[in-house]
């Protein structure tokens, strides 16, 4: 693929700025991506990018759970029928600590230099996941980090108000984790006798309805 001269120039300049850190960069499909090796360097590197290459906007913060990455099928044992995929088995996951299970991703924009980049980092501990907040660098990170915490259970050190933002404050679990059941753990309904909303254990059977498909 032919890379534009301007994009290559931006890539080389940013690579030079980050030369003192454990960072790997690439240009793929017309996009610049940098991967940070040590999550403890995230705040310092992003601060450096904002100051020295004028990335004054953080457009998004998100995460990815790689718990089942690379598995070509659900773990369904011997329940695959002759007519195709079985619908009679609940999918179970191993939830033990897995290094590099989660990856956090930052999307940055420099209007002064007319360039966007992606900065990402694999997180080392899958049980206690702690990343320094960048809400002091970009106010837009405040709610974006709250969403990542809510959906993935990643905690942000020094965040001013780390609360759930999409689910209820009493919600159990983190819905975008691969080991979170599709039915959830509890369901909510209005109880006329009590005059309030109540939570009850989910009574829906969790069943695998479709085969797992990974496309190259």
Swiss-Prot record:
Q: Does the keyword Transmembrane helix apply?
A: no
* Topology of this chain in the membrane: Peripheral membrane protein
Q: Which residues form a coiled coil?
A: none
What Pfam families does the record point to?
Complex1_30kDa
Transmembrane portions of the chain = none
Q: What class of enzyme is it?
A: translocase
Annotated catalysed reactions: a quinone + NADH + 5 H(+)(in) = a quinol + NAD(+) + 4 H(+)(out)
Thylakoid in keyword set? no
Known EC number(s)?
7.1.1.-
Q: Its domain of life?
A: Bacteria
Q: Which UniProt keywords apply?
A: Cell inner membrane, Cell membrane, Membrane, NAD, Quinone, Translocase, Transport, Ubiquinone
Query: PROSITE patterns from the xrefs?
Result: COMPLEX1_30K
* Subcellular location field: Cell inner membrane
Q: What is its main location?
A: membrane
Q: Hey, which family's this protein in?
A: Belongs to the complex I 30 kDa subunit family.
Function comment: NDH-1 shuttles electrons from NADH, via FMN and iron-sulfur (Fe-S) centers, to quinones in the respiratory chain. The immediate electron acceptor for the enzyme in this species is believed to be ubiquinone. Couples the redox reaction to proton translocation (for every two electrons transferred, four hydrogen ions are translocated across the cytoplasmic membrane), and thus conserves the redox energy in a proton gradient.
Q: Which HAMAP family match?
A: NDH1_NuoC
Classification via NCBIfam families: NuoC_fam (TIGR01961), PRK06074.1-1 (NF004730)
The name this protein goes by in its record: NADH-quinone oxidoreductase subunit C
Report the source organism: Francisella tularensis subsp. holarctica (strain OSU18)
What phylogenetic lineage does the species belong to?
Answer: Bacteria, Pseudomonadati, Pseudomonadota, Gammaproteobacteria, Thiotrichales
